[in-house]
Structure formats: C-alpha cells, structure tokens
Amino acid sequence: MKTKLGFNRLSRKSSHRRALLKNMVISFFKHEKISSTKTKLFEVKRFAERLITRAKVDTVHNRRELSKFIHDKYILNKLFTKISPVFRQRSGGYTRMIKLGKRYGDAAEMAILELVEKPLKVE
C-alpha cells in the first residue's frame, strides 16, 4: 500500500530537485522575495523556514551546517546577521505566500513567497 510522501518530487530526479531548491532558496534570501509556481514555492518555504530556525542560534556548528546548503558566504552572513535576528521571538511562520492566479500559457498557479518581517539594516 502506497503512503503519501512528505514532499513533492517536482517531476525531477533527486539531484536536479535539490539543485533547484538550493538555487531558489539562495535567491529568496538574496532578494527577500521570490515569484514562481505555487508547488515549487511550497517546497522552498519548507527549506527556508528550517534554515531560518537553524540560523536563530549563531554558533560555529550551525554556520557549518547551513554552509552545506548555502555556498554563498554573503548570503550565509546575511541570514545570520540580518534575517534571523528579526525572528528571534517568533517560533515559526517566517514567510508568507501570496497567490497571484494562473500563468498565461500553461495555467500554472503562480505565487510570491516573501518574508513576514523586513530584515535589519546593518551597515
């Protein structure tokens, strides 16, 4: 008997799916907002929320664990210094998804994923 998977496969092989999610998460943290299909954004949201939760405690171990997923040092530093301090008091729900409707051409459900609160302006 088949049971429901805990994630969406996105019609890709595991290496392609992982690379897609990694690139989308990096773009999300870089621009603090991303637009794509609703299905892809559900998976990006799951990863992004886990990474923000991990980044709330700034330790060497957590930085090394997140650097396995985020290879850009600027984005990694931004996550630890600007994004995660805003969410220290929040126990989850760091992102929101705004549905845009159907895309012209293939009628795919489109959406925008953004952070609930704006990151700190640290200079």
UniProtKB/Swiss-Prot annotation:
MF term (GO), any: structural constituent of ribosome
Pfam family, one: Ribosomal_L17
SUPFAM superfamilies per the UniProt record, alphabetical: Prokaryotic ribosomal protein L17
Signal peptide feature range: none
TM regions (residue ranges): none
Organism domain of life: Bacteria
GO cellular component, one term: cytosolic large ribosomal subunit
One GO biological process term: translation
UniProtKB keywords: Ribonucleoprotein, Ribosomal protein
The family this protein is said to belong to: Belongs to the bacterial ribosomal protein bL17 family.
UniProt cross-references to PANTHER family, sorted A to Z: LARGE RIBOSOMAL SUBUNIT PROTEIN BL17M, RIBOSOMAL PROTEIN L17
NCBIfam families (UniProt xref): L17 (TIGR00059)
Subunit note: Part of the 50S ribosomal subunit. Contacts protein L32.
Protein's name according to its UniProt entry: Large ribosomal subunit protein bL17
